[in-house]
A protein has these predicted regions:
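Double-stranded RNA-binding/processing signature
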Residues: 1-161
Length: 161
């Protein structure tokens, strides 16, 4: 994308944010059917933030005051490799709606960074999209259940490796 095109899109996004800001005063969960129709990559974007915040909160509970240690731990939990491993173990317990979102996210056209394999990145995108779906549709109990299970899976992997 060229710089001028980027600047134009950024300004358009700011205009939309201003419009949305005047129309909405707080977050209101959408119905599952509304969220299923959303772009899977956008759900993954939200899911990435939700899971990152969850992991940061868990790590901060340890009362470690060294930010470098905290950052390293968080990075190991939220990297594509860890998320992919967790997703592979969680995939069998996903609901039909969650499987639909995961499949769409996995098959989306995303640029894979050099730090992970295509499979890992696609699985982690699917995992994040499921979390984004649950967050956006207000399914907090299910969201917490999957994040806790993913956390436990990753923690076991880190303690053995």
């Amino acid at each position: 994308m060229k710089f001028k095109q980027f600047q134009f899109l950024k300004q358009e996004a700011i205009k939309k944010l201003i419009l949305l800001d005047t129309e909405h005063s707080s977050f209101v969960p959408k119905s599952a059917s509304e969220v299923i129709a959303s772009d899977a990559v956008m759900l993954a974007y939200i899911g990435d933030a939700v899971y990152s915040m969850y992991i940061r909160q868990r790590v901060v509970e340890m009362s470690i005051s060294k930010v470098q240690v905290l950052h390293t731990l968080v990075t190991e939990f939220i990297c594509a490799k860890s998320q992919s491993k967790a997703f592979e173990q969680l995939e069998s317990i996903l609901t039909e709606d969650e499987q639909t979102i995961a499949r769409r996210a996995r098959n989306s056209n995303v640029n894979v960074p050099k730090s992970s394999s295509v499979r890992e990145y696609r699985n982690s995108t699917a995992f994040e999209a499921v979390l984004g779906f649950l967050y956006e549709s207000g399914q907090q109990d299910r969201l917490n259940e999957l994040m806790q299970e993913a956390y436990s899976i990753t923690l076991r992997g880190l303690s053995h490796g």
